[in-house]
Every structure is written in structure tokens, then in C-alpha cells.
């Protein structure tokens, strides 16, 4: 069984309440149940923190044992060299996800400090961005292909 860790960063604990026109009305916990039902071949763990260092600690904790990490770093995406370095330090492939199309939003959201360290980026598909990331991470061909591309 593949082990997938979802990590959500700052303010994503407010999904369903925060800016529903941007992020939708569903809580992440409700969506997580759907993901687990859709991917019974994967053990999907979930972690959320508003604290940068705690997110880094979680990446370090699972980054050598899990088959994939789905990371929505929230606003830390645009500011954190430390997250970039944490992703580069581990062997588990990381897919960066965003619920909204960050390139259609404020200009300060157009630059990601972590994309270059990730195996892939999926954004703008609402909560389905997570499903798309898990689908790729659970596909054996993805790991082989991304190893060739990123090495």
C-alpha cells in the first residue's frame, strides 16, 4: 500500500469558511474522506500547521519513508527558502498543489520558492488539485519518469 502524506500550510485549516469564492465551501476534512474512498490502494495521512517550522519537521519526518507528499504550503510557497531546502533534503517526491490559480491572483503570489524543489506543480483545479496529485503519486510510472526528469 502506498503511503501519501498531505501537508497543508497556513490558513488552510479555514477551508470552507475562508474566502469561499476563492477556496469553495467544503472543509478539507470532508474532502479528505472522499480522497481516502477514491484511493483505497493508498494510505493517506493528513497534517496541517500554520507554523513554518512544524511543516518542515513533518517533511523531515515522512520524507524518507513515504511514497509521496502533497504539499500546499499556502503563503509560505512565496516566501520560504527553508521549505525549499527541506524538500530538497528528502528523497520522497513532493507535488506542490494550490486550490486556486495563483497566477490569476495578486502578483506577489506569482513566484513560488518551492516549485523548483518539487517533482511537479498542480494548481487552479480547486480541491481536485489534491486528487490529481495523489493520482500521479500513486502511479508507479510517475516515480520512474520523474526520477529521469529530475536527475
Residue ranges and their predicted role:
Residues 1-4:
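Extreme N-terminal starter segment of soluble prokaryotic enzymes
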Residues 10-12, 74-77, 100-102:
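Short glycine-rich anion-binding loops that position phosphate/pyrophosphate groups of nucleotides
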Residues 14-29:
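Glycine- and acidic-residue-enriched helix-capping/strand-helix junction motifs
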Residues 45-53:
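Short beta->alpha junction loops
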Residues 62-69:
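Short acidic/histidine-rich motifs immediately flanking catalytic phosphotransfer sites
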Residues 80-89:
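Short Gly/Thr/Asp-enriched flexible loops that form oxyanion-binding sites at enzyme active sites
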Residues 89-105:
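Short, acidic/small-residue loops that bind anionic groups at enzyme active sites
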Residues 104-147:
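Short, glycine-/small-residue-rich phosphate/pyrophosphate-handling segment
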Amino acid at each position: 500500500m502506498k503511503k501519501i502524506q498531505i501537508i497543508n500550510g497556513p490558513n488552510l485549516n479555514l477551508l470552507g469558511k475562508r474566502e469561499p469564492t476563492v477556496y469553495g465551501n467544503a472543509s478539507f476534512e470532508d474532502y479528505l474522506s472522499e480522497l481516502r474512498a477514491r484511493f483505497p490502494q493508498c494510505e493517506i495521512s493528513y497534517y496541517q500547521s500554520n507554523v513554518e517550522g512544524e511543516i518542515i519537521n513533518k517533511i523531515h519526518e515522512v520524507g524518507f519513508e513515504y511514497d509521496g507528499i502533497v504539499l500546499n504550503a499556502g503563503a509560505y510557497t512565496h516566501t520560504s527558502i527553508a521549505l525549499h531546502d527541506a524538500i530538497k533534503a528528502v528523497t520522497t517526491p513532493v507535488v506542490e498543489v494550490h486550490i486556486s490559480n495563483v497566477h490569476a491572483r495578486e502578483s506577489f503570489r506569482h513566484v513560488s520558492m518551492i516549485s523548483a524543489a518539487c517533482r511537479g506543480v498542480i494548481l487552479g483545479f480547486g480541491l481536485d488539485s489534491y486528487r490529481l496529485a495523489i493520482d500521479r503519486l500513486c502511479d508507479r510510472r510517475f516515480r520512474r519518469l520523474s526520477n529521469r526528469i529530475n536527475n
